Amino acid sequence: MALQGNLFGDAEPASSAPSKGQKRQDEPDQLDDHELTQDAKQRPRQRQGQQEHSEPSASSQSEEAHSEASTPAGKDQDNSDDDLPPWSHHSQVTPEQLTPMLRHYVELKAAHPERILLYRLGDFFECFFEDAIHLSRLLELTLTGKEAGKQIGRVPMAGIPHHAAERYCSELIRRGLSVALCDQLEAAPASGSAKGTLLRRDITRVLTPGTVLEEGLLSARRNNWLAAVVVEPAQGRQPFRWGLACADVSTGEFLVREQDNSAALHQELARLDPAELIHHNQNSVAPSWCPERLQRCDIGNTPFSQPEAEALLLERFRLQTLDGLGLQNVPLAMRAAGGLIAYLGETCPLDDNGITPPPLERPITCFPGDALVLDAQTRRNLELIATQRDNQFQGSLLWAIDRTLTAMGARCLRRWIEAPLMDPSIIRSRQASVSQLVSKRPLRQALRRLLRPMGDLERLAGRAGAGHAGARDLVAIADGLERLPQLANLITSQLDGGPSWLSDVLEPDPALAVIGASIRHQLMDNPPLSLSEGGLIHDGVDPLLDGLRNQLDDQESWLAEQEQLERQSSNNSNLKLQYHRTFGYFLSVSRARSGAVPDHWIRRQTLANEERFITPDLKAREGQIFQMRARAAQREYELFCELRGQIGEHAEAIRRSARAIAGLDALTSLAEAAATGGWCAPEITADRSMVIEQGRHPVVEQLLVEDAFTPNDSNLGTGIDLVVLTGPNASGKSCYLRQIGLIQLLAQIGSWVPAQAARIGIADRIFTRVGAVDDLAAGQSTFMVEMAETANILHHASERSLVLLDEIGRGTATFDGLSIAWAVSEHLAGDLQARTVFATHYHELNALAGERSNVANCQVLVEETGSDLVFLHRVAAGGASRSYGIEAARLAGVPASVVQRARQVLDQLAT
């Protein structure tokens, strides 16, 4: 079995059967388990302090360095197809003509044609045929060849060192590719054994973008969603309907949803941004509801039927009935969940040792109306997760408020931003917790000190449950579990009440304390990364292991005695008995003294300044020590696997506490941002009001270094539904629009907001149309993109929506554009009565305020000082009459002659 604690790591320590013969204390490999246990009782081992894991004897480092067989390709490398052999694809060869190893490779490749197959050969993962060509080009590796049989000759081969496989696989996963790992399931035979026997190998892991568990392959601060979709196209009066299931196998979260409307599916997929999407698609063309950049994996030739899905769900969650899952009214979502579980079964199958697929929690059904709706355009315009210009984290809303200290807290805060709340009671409860943490600075700081060193318990528990956790993962789990009582004491002693979901921190499962204590009792505090070389388990844990260690101590004593004896026999006080990983134990003497060694010494190696020898006794004892050490390492691995299995059984309880800790971390982050930024707690109302006093942009305010941000008021929904905002170019109108949208969103995640005071009603959707670009690939001009976005708003906005418009109609003739802008404004203020701020350079729209009582005019002020224009960035009542476009052009660096000519043309047009 390949070690599950280190995906690309060591082979399982091979146990050695004791040889026959007389049993003596100095030949412990011949002792049975009972005698070793008795030895441990007679000579009990005392628990030692943490020691560095090192080689078992005095060592001299290897002078040789192995070169990697697959190195970055040089400039003279030519990977053109003309140089490839005719069998550059595995399907072109006859398996019977291949060597046994390559025949096995082709069989596995035929079962995984869509994945890159990495086949373990010694210290390398190799691939052949088309995968070798693909891998060499993707990773810039040397493309070489391997003899495949007399009738075939050489076939393409490329490979990567097994110790660097995680780095290379990470790059492949990042590119959206899937990888099948074929590892050795048994140790290589000892030297001198019969050659030509094919080692047992099989697929041990399938790595896909949506199913990876390894820390190095995941982004710590965001969920890694695997999504499955089942759709029913519109037929007659039946609308388009879809079911969605998404799971993060690294954290165990499992969500399902069912709804009408393909646009809603597109929005949900854009919000989740899954790493991988699986669905049934009978066409080669991607469906319109699927964002183009998502990695798709078509499943099967037939959609999953409801009976198949029900059977898979019952088996997965070990249920007799699905009534408790609440999926009866969402049949498409149930089928999607079944497809997702079937895909996990293919990529994470049960192995011979009972290693289970990643543990998932029971699915939670999400309903329309649970969260504020944000379409993809609004997410981009408000720059929630990344900036619009260069897609960078710095400069986004999440960057501005993320003070989280744990990876799970960062993911939680991101989820809050991506799905703001709609339930006023939940919003107020979360806001009350933030308020308490703001007012209690010592408590907030104490909580943050405890949270800072905490590991990612959510994902650590998942790896333990899937049998992939290493020893250091388990130690990190113990560290986190030990902090639960400290967090609980702080909260109960200083926080009045607290949210109900904090109960998993205040009253954790009692079994978690037992788990933490068991890890501390058994595992070293700083265990090695490798699970196959010992150094994992404390003394005093297992009598059999203690007995083996006693015998190893005896052998170390024998080696020390032997060194003294050989010094005396050779009359050489500088002689050293040393150990080398490759050459084993040897006697080292200087070249000058090498001619006067005893006759029974056997020369083993000659170096520049020393000679290395062995003796028959030393060689015999070396074999015994190696066998004994292998038995001890095997026993440590068995004990570790037992412990990991016990922890995996409690993965769900660990995750519950981890989710509570994540929420606590997110709350302290919001409190820290509010306390340090001078924010206020908004009043959440049941009406449509949005009254903001001295509001500020939460991101721009932090980015300003020299100048102070100019705060502004906003008033919507209290008699005014539409504000027509006019003012010069580059005066800050777009910033003001985004500021309003971000304050609305912050209020609905339960956060404080950057303002002096605020009263905010719940919005069902936020729409933005800020700036426009063409979409040439889709055959749409800038104006058509603008009109499509406007149409989407007019079709879906309601009186509880917040609409933020920055210029409509500017991409066509002036009067056409003005007419469109006027009609859109009337529709928003009249038919929809949606809360709207419309920034425009069509000053004619100021007349709407005289026609409709729910329309008001505002302007961004500027100050003219001679020929200069000073932007005040202050919003005031009333409409502007000029846009100062020529002055803005001058400030942007347009040549003076062009600016002067523009003024002349403007004067001519004005007359």
Swiss-Prot record:
The UniProt record gives the binding positions of ATP as G727, P728, N729, A730, S731, G732, K733, S734
Cellular component (GO) terms are:
cytosol
Region labeled Disordered — which residues?
Answer: 1-95
Key words of the record:
ATP-binding, DNA damage, DNA repair, DNA-binding, Nucleotide-binding
Q: What InterPro entries is this protein classified in?
A: DNA_mismatch_repair_MutS (IPR005748), DNA_mismatch_repair_MutS-lik_N (IPR007695), DNA_mismatch_repair_MutS/MSH (IPR017261), DNA_mismatch_repair_MutS_C (IPR000432), DNA_mismatch_repair_MutS_clamp (IPR007861), DNA_mismatch_repair_MutS_core (IPR007696), DNA_mismatch_repair_MutS_N (IPR016151), DNA_mismatch_repair_MutS_sf (IPR036187)
- Which GO terms fall under molecular function for this chain's record? ATP binding; ATP-dependent DNA damage sensor activity; damaged DNA binding; mismatched DNA binding
Q: Name one Pfam family in it.
A: MutS_III
Keyword presence, Electron transport: no
- HAMAP family, A to Z: MutS
Task: State what this protein does.
Answer: This protein is involved in the repair of mismatches in DNA. It is possible that it carries out the mismatch recognition step. This protein has a weak ATPase activity.
NCBIfam families xref list: mutS1 (TIGR01070), PRK05399.1 (NF003810)
Report what the protein is called: DNA mismatch repair protein MutS
Annotated organism of origin:
Synechococcus sp. (strain CC9311)
Which classification does the entry list for the species? Bacteria, Bacillati, Cyanobacteriota, Cyanophyceae, Synechococcales
Which gene carries the instructions for this protein? mutS
